[in-house]
Amino acid sequence: MGSVTEKVPEPKKWILNAFTMSSPGHVASGLWRHPDNQTHRYKDITYWIELAQLLDGNFHGLFLADMLGVYNVYKGPGNIEPVIPGAAQFPISDPSLPIAAMASVTKTLSFGITASTTYESPFLLARRYSTLDHLTNGRVAWNIVTSYLESAALNLRLKTQMQHDERYAKAEEFMEVVYKLLEGS
């Protein structure tokens, strides 16, 4: 047992991040039916502004997941019919676009955005994220993914999804280019 004069360490502060998508249905199928749910407003900039204001000061960040394809594997490959009624991350819009508006009405909230090294252009991604970095005063982060959905490849005019090792080799080169483009931006 320690002595009475020992200092009790300060409890560690929690880091809280909200997690959503620019879609009416995220990871909880059917949640869009809850009476208080507002995700049906995902195409309305005031929805994103109100969400950011609600989170600012109480959460450290808002993480916006993204995907470039549709979960089309249930009941056979290429079948999107089961996805639509459940709004299973569908439809989905570009999560980076409302960030500047959200940053303009918040003081401390950070924004994490998913972007794929498989399908993005290093120059265009560096340009977009550098712009967001400046507009948010450094409150933007990148969730780096290589993508995995066959439907994403098809959406982007490829015949098939790249194999795992090929995607990760491309990601390594992609990151080197993006780092160089972002240096000093």
Model-derived segments and their meaning:
Residues M1-G2, L125:
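Short amphipathic alpha-helical surface micro-motifs
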Residues G2-V105:
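N-terminal beta1-alpha1-beta2 module of alpha/beta enzyme domains
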Residues P11-K12, F19-M21, H26-R41, T117-S185:
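Flexible, glycine-rich active-site loops centered on histidine and acidic residues
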Residues N58, K107, T136-G138:
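Active-site-proximal glycine-rich helix-loop-beta segment
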Residues F59-D66, F111-G112, W142-V145:
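Short beta-strand segments at enzyme active-site cores
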Residues P77, A115-S116:
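Short linear capping/connector segments at secondary-structure termini
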Residues S104-I113:
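Conserved catalytic cysteine-centered active-site region
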